[in-house]
Amino acid sequence: SAFSGRELARKMAVVLTDRVKPELMTGYDIVATGRYPYTGRLGILSREDIRKVEEAMSLVDAKDLGSRLFVSLSDGQKQRLLLARAICQEPEILVLDEPTSFLDIKYKLELLDILRRMAKEQGITVILSLHEIDLAGKISDKVMPVKAGRVYDCGSPEEILREEFIRRLYDMDKGSFDPVFGSIELPRPAGKPETMVISACGRGIPVYRRLQKEGIPFIAGILYRNDMDYQLARHLASRVIAAEPFQDIEDSVYEEAREAVSGCSRVYYTDIPWGSSNRRFRQLLEEVKGRRDARCIYEASGDRIGYGT
């Protein structure tokens, strides 16, 4: 049989993107409407109802908004109060439409943490629509992408949020999605690369991003395939020279790097932790420093120290 309105309100709460505009209602009044499915005909709050309202407002860090007129608040503050209203409704299912809209990063993280804890600790089923793929991967147990108004697929974040799947889902012909960082990357610069970056341990990433912003195509290497630099370089670099992790660099890989750097007029290198397995990094770097036809630029903490011409 169908639920009555009161019964349905005890089962499901909804937080929509559209903003309500109630006149002369305070933040507390808005949150308290979440308790009306539990009140009598006159809508009078019991002590238990008041406690639930106050707990919900504390949970979303909105107690200081209780006495202020709802229409006078910012969009982010309104969003927190509407979430508090849904929380004190004590539903079995919570549906949220773009709940992170209008929120700065601090409250966005707090909101997602609250939703995650509600699902885990209270057994509430949380259904939310998001355009932020990175957040969907971090918070969701299941991801259901929608395309052209239809469910495109359904599965775990690991199954759905893959590079090629996202490319097909959004019909992307430029740029790429990185499932490791959960980030969207702009297209790599076009043209013949005359710049090379020698780095390791994630220290080349700031250089990659600056070169991309300046529209300078570049070669990255030698990079171990399990290095953070490698993960981003495969999206941004024109060419990546890679080596297998936890092994000495093979002669063929080293010669490929020598050949690549010989055609570059500018070489960036970063702080690299030296060890026995990557000693050929240093060998390659020393060869570059000995050249007079190339500029070798050291990168550390944003500082540049130039060598050569």
Name every feature range the model reports, one short phrase each.
Residues 43-44, 69-73, 77:
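Conserved ABC ATPase signature
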Residues 148-149:
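Conserved ABC ATPase "signature" C-loop
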Residues 171-249, 269-270, 276-279, 297-309:
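ABC ATPase nucleotide-binding domains
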Residues 32, 47-66:
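Conserved ABC ATPase "signature" region
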Residues 90:
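Conserved catalytic motifs of ABC-family nucleotide-binding domains
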Residues 94-98:
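Catalytic Walker B motif of ABC-type/P-loop ATPase nucleotide-binding domains
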Residues 109-122:
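Helical segment within the ABC ATPase nucleotide-binding domain
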